[in-house]
Amino acid sequence: MNKTLNQKAWFFVIPVFVLVAFNAVVPLMTVVNYSFQETFGSNVFAWEGTRWFKEILHSERFHASLGRQFIFTFIILLIQLPLGIGIALTMPKKGWGVPVCLILMSMPLLIPWNVVGAMWNIFALPEIGFLGNTLNSIGFDYNFTQQSGDAWFTTILMDVWHWTSLVVLLSYAGLNSIQPAYYQAAEIDGASRWDIFRYIEIPKMKKVLTLAILLRFMDSFMIYTEPFVLTGGGPGNATNFLSLDLVKMALGQFDLGPAAAMSLIYFLIVLLVCWIFYSIMMKDEGRV
């Protein structure tokens, strides 16, 4: 009976595997193929070996865009994690305020990425945008279309507005999963609010926070649509992150070989960082 059920289950699962293979494995193998060859159009290829990988790894352009990507991701995590946890701590755990807060927190996540970029482009315009006009009216010389610092500030602010809600919702779920008995024991022992947060809430939220960090790292490190619509990578190359530079190389310059090599390096960096972080967190959890 069990074997029959397992066979029926596999019958329904196989189409999913085929779909995943078609949408993931086949494009990946195509990129690998292009990364070792030079294309001359009309399906004419010449073998190049590891030439494109060496060229990318020694390219100052690649180093600069990769550096900007890491800096952006670090700043985003540094802001969104504490902010998201702080907001989650202030949210009610029961009553009519719960659904209201959850709906408000979910709304930014439901807006498409290109719409977010367009919204913030209009919102931050120095002359007619609310943010730009307000900053200039109080004495700041703000213009994200011409000044690199303002472009970075606007891009970071946009991402914080768009994605902090994800950290809030995950943190809120982690807080609600903590048994009331822990809080009761802490109250009996006379623990302060800081002690409860440090010794009860943070340890109990470790898995949820690990997930939040991994998701936000991957999202922020591979960000493309929002900064493309907002700044286009400018002014100059100020916000030309690795994701934008990759698209410019592949579609703008049509350098498919170097672009394929860069995309594989990009992919491996994301996998490596996620694996290292996850291994450290799981090792630390095993000690506990």
What are the residue ranges of the model-derived segments?
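A structural signal for multi-pass alpha-helical bundles of membrane permease subunits
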Residues: 2-288
